[in-house]
Amino acid sequence: MFKLTSSPHIHSGKLTARIMLWVIFGMLPALAVQVYYFGFGVLIQICLAVALALILEFAVTKLRKKPSLFYISDFSVILTALILAMAIPPYAPYWVILIGTFCAVILGKHVYGGLGQNLFNPAMVGYVVLLISFPVQMTGWMPPISLLHEPPTFGDSLGLIFSGVTGDGFSLSQLVSSIDGLSSATPLDSAKTWLKSGGSATDLLNQPIFLPGLEAGLGWLQVNLAFFIGGLFLIWKKAIHWQTPVAILLSLGIFCGLFDLFGNAQAVGFFAQLFSGAMMFGAFFIATDPVTAPVTPKGKWVFGILIGLLICLIRQFGNYPDGVAFAVLLANICVPLIDQYTRPRVAGYGLNGRN
């Protein structure tokens, strides 16, 4: 006897849970590098985000009378929490990640009906809510711990996140200000502020957070390289499509080259654009979300080019130094339109004056 089931009857065998696990696995190198350069804070943020995300997923699916364990076991909510936790400053107060996780899971996902129904990337919804609502907490990045006199221990990291001070009573700002030339700003933020104030690129690169001779920051370059390697792994495993990240990086390079060509004094160099902030993170792990990205190869190219253009414009003219999250969300709005104009025509379309 054959069992009657709904389509599709032929599939690739790539279950949602398997793809999510590959993406999580691809993020592990960047996580290890981030812990090495910026301390244990990111691990604590991940634990808080994942714990709350699982609780919310369980509660909402129960309220909607759906099988909670089935939806939790696809690992999508864990991936959302992981992306959000790795995107925020490692030593942000604990309530920041809790609010962001709530917004990501509830507002970014379940308001639209759950996995597969959301218009926007859930993690970026949570991130943008935090960035707009709590700009001070969301811009307080720890410089690489190798530049500090005494790198924070795991206990110090717990203290900074839950009480705002280490075991010795030092706040994050006090730890940073103890070293001349250091600030809690990211290299992109420092470069944007410095160049807008009329400072020279040579003096900018002499700051301790920048690698000698490069506009990319210490720690940030290595984290972006790790995300790049993880992204190549995902492409190799066919967990993501290559068109979107390639389109983002190529378009960003072209538009940044145009700014350099016309001599924009406030423009950050091409190398810094690619290997600073959340560039590789966004290109390979955020913009490639299959739910919120176009479905056709041509659409993925258009989507990636749009994101690259928006990132370049926000970084050059906007108030925010990075712009990846805003670019992805703005491009998400355009996905239905992109799909409409890039999907292949059905055979026989337009024959005899009929569609």
Swiss-Prot record:
Q: Where does this protein reside within or beyond the cell?
A: Cell inner membrane
Q: Which cofactor does it need?
A: FMN
Q: Does the keyword Electron transport apply?
A: yes
Q: Per its UniProt record, what InterPro entries does this chain match?
A: NqrB/RnfD, RnfD_bac
Biological process GO terms, please? Answer: electron transport chain; transmembrane transport
Q: What is its EC number?
A: 7.-.-.-
For membrane topology, the record states: Multi-pass membrane protein
Show the Pfam families listed in the entry.
NQR2_RnfD_RnfE
* Keyword vocabulary terms for this entry: Cell inner membrane, Cell membrane, Electron transport, Flavoprotein, FMN, Membrane, Phosphoprotein, Translocase, Transmembrane, Transmembrane helix, Transport
TM helices/strands, residue ranges: 13-33, 35-55, 77-97, 98-118, 128-148, 216-236, 245-265, 267-287, 294-314, 318-338
Gene Ontology cellular component annotations, sorted alphabetically: plasma membrane
Residues annotated as carrying FMN phosphoryl threonine in the record are T186
**Oligomer and partners:** The complex is composed of six subunits: RnfA, RnfB, RnfC, RnfD, RnfE and RnfG.
Function statement: Part of a membrane-bound complex that couples electron transfer with translocation of ions across the membrane.
The Swiss-Prot or TrEMBL record describes its family as follows: Belongs to the NqrB/RnfD family.
Name of the protein in its database record = Ion-translocating oxidoreductase complex subunit D
Q: What is the lineage of its organism?
A: Bacteria, Pseudomonadati, Pseudomonadota, Gammaproteobacteria, Pasteurellales
Q: Which gene encodes it?
A: rnfD
